């Protein structure tokens, strides 16, 4: 992940701040953090996840998938603003820069974000009372981590691989891991003979 200048700011300042570029930022510990651009593989996995969710929630229901809108978190007085790859909310979607009451949060793990997503964002997302599930979908290898709130407690499942499914309590059905990786080839790229 590309780092922004270490300029501390409040959440209110961050929400109106413009650095004059097309760079997207998250706010962590009062410091804006630039988000690395997504790869083609990352984008395809994100779209596949959205399709898998849409198949379960339908197009006419009260819940909607929101792509790359912000989530506001306040943890021990520290305001944070994350931009997950996908979130599902059953509230009206407004012009606000953030999502109200997400039920499901999806992060696609990239080489530069894996540790932050798993070590920081997952525990932070789990503090939101509305969130029932968090999915981490790896773009580096076919591996999915699912976290679910069950009877008020968070349960993390063993890492899931292709040909496995998991029961999504929020979506009310099984989700195949293969659905996230449709069209993705993880075989090593052939060696470039011209690079010798």
Label each residue range with its predicted role.
Residues 1-196:
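Gly/Pro/Ser/Thr-rich low-complexity, intrinsically disordered segments predominantly at protein N-termini
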